Amino acid sequence: AMVEQLQMTAQARHFDFFILSDTTDPDIWLREEAFWATTRAALSGEVGLYYRHRTDNTYRKSGNIRDFCERWGSQYRYMVVLDADSLLEGPTLVEMVRRMELDPQIALVQAPPAPVNRLSFFARMQQFSARVYGQVFNSGFALWVQDDGNYWGHNAIIRIEPFMDHCGLPKLPGVPPLGGEILSHDFVEAAMLREAGWKVVLDHDLQGSYEQCPTNLID
């Protein structure tokens, strides 16, 4: 759906998509590759669709993104990070790139995602709440933080060069939960970019940003 919407904007040739798999289940791995091959064959070729599976998922999501940056980051100016359950509409993707181009001091633009497509009572409460006051919250948050915004780990566009220069995460001394790998990597990466003098912004007016929320407290 994202590729189809991009094609409608006439800007699809400027985008490539990467499926960055970290699964340790061989059956899921095979299904992912089959889905990728089928989807790639169905595309017109205007948009690149690539699949990469890591056999060693060191540092989890942050390590997955680091691996992408080390392999392919030099070929791109920006990357848009998505979770498996999140998406951005085609016009929103184009607009995010436009805003990055307009201000070369911005390292990260976060598009606030609206929770969708869950049916449990817990999830429906979140979706209803976001619908009622999500825009007010995002507007107020953006007003207060200005260029000192945050990164929520997905549905954001990132300038790759400063991200690679400043966002290498250390392993904390001691034992978990206070030591070891940094799990809330997104907050730390945003702070590192700000410390290096780059802008991190929440653009509350961006529409067409979605994610699936947890269905219960355990998830």
Each PLM stretch: what is its role?
Residues A1-D219:
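Internal catalytic domains of large membrane-associated glycosyltransferases
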